[in-house]
C-alpha cells in the first residue's frame, strides 16, 4: 500500500509516496523524538539542538541513528561508548548518562552480539564494573579478554591530560577500530580546547579528553552517534 506524501506530515525529503511500512517506521521515529524533546524543567537547549539535528538528518533523528547502527554493527563487532561527565562541586561523575550507557551496552550485546567498550574517566571505572555485573555482563579492563569472551564489556579509562590524549586515541583506534562509536553525555572541548559545564564554568581539568578519540574515529570513517541532554 502507498500513501501520497502530501498526506504525511513533515516529509522533508520530498518523497512522492510512502509505503505502510515506511509510514509506521516514521511514526515510531517521530514518537521517540517527541519523547526525547520533552522539557519539563524548561531548560530549552534540547529543542534548539534538536532543530539542527533534524535539519541535518531530514528525518526523525532516533530512527536515523538506529538504522545507521543496524547497518554498521554485526556479531562480534566492537562498539565504543564514550561516557562520563564529572560534575562540580563534588568532582564526581554524573550517573544518568552512565546508567544509559550500561543499558545501551547490554542492548548492543543482545541485539547484535556486539562487543561494547566503555571509554570513560578513571572516576567512572569502578561504577561501570559494578553496573556491568548488574545487567548480566562480565566486565574487563583487558580489551583482548573482553573481545574474546561472550557477554562481555570492556572498560577503558581515558586520560584527562590533553598532551597524552592524541597518543591514547591513536593507540585505541589502532588496536581496536570499532564498527561504530556512540557518545553518551561525554564532554567535549570548544574551539579553544576549553571544557565547560552547563552553566559555563571551566571544568577542563576534571574531564576525560575522550573527544580526541571521537575525532580520531570520525576521521577514520567510523559511523558515529551522539546523545546528550
Question: Predicted segment positions?
Answer:
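Short, Lys/Arg-enriched N-terminal segments with co-localized hydrophobic residues
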Residues: 7-17
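Short, glycine-rich nucleotide/cofactor-binding loops
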Residues: 54-56, 78-79, 83-100
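Histidine-anchored nucleotide/phosphate-binding helix
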Residues: 94-113
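An acidic, phosphate/nucleotide-engaging active-site surface
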Residues: 130-214
